């Protein structure tokens, strides 16, 4: 289960600097899952939240994990309403995850450019257990189209997208 646009409040102190979160402008995403996974699996996932045109906006996109023939996790969230998207494709230069990415949807309703700022990469290979992860944080810009045809212009929305391959 993934929940977007969860209002955040509070503060965090890192390296002597205080960061304050305001519920009007700051949001979090909850990612919670359970189940039985295959030994060898790969998924692509991205999520982000912010304010667009003065209203809460979020998205959840992904594929590669599980059977999505009946349903997928691709959604827009705008002003408290969910908007279903068709299939999304992540276009990534896997030789360099810090190069810009693009995202396209089969229905044309999620067309974005992504400029990475940080690749939280991890790779472990102990033969029986393998993980190769690139959780990349950056800025998303482009267009998102709501169910009623309203086009939202997205500019520099901080978010993340990941490419994860596990064997365990």
Give the location of each predicted region:
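Structured soluble/peripheral alpha/beta segments that form catalytic or ligand/cofactor-binding pockets
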Residues: 1-168
């Amino acid at each position: 289960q993934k929940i977007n646009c969860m209002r955040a409040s509070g503060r965090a102190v890192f390296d002597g600097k205080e960061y304050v979160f305001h519920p009007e402008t700051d949001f979090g995403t909850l990612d919670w899952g359970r189940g039985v996974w295959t030994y060898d699996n790969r998924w692509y996932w991205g999520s982000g939240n912010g304010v667009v045109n003065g209203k809460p906006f979020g998205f959840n996109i992904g594929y590669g994990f599980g059977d999505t023939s009946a349903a997928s996790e691709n959604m827009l969230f705008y002003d408290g309403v969910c908007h279903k998207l068709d299939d999304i494709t992540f276009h990534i230069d896997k030789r360099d995850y810090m190069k810009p990415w693009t995202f396209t949807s089969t229905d044309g309703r999620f067309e974005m450019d992504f400029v990475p700022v940080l690749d939280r990469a991890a790779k472990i290979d102990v033969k029986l257990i393998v993980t190769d992860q690139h959780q990349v944080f950056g800025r998303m810009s482009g267009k998102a189209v709501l169910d009623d045809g309203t086009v939202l212009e997205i500019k520099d929305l901080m978010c993340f997208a990941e490419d994860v391959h596990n064997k365990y």
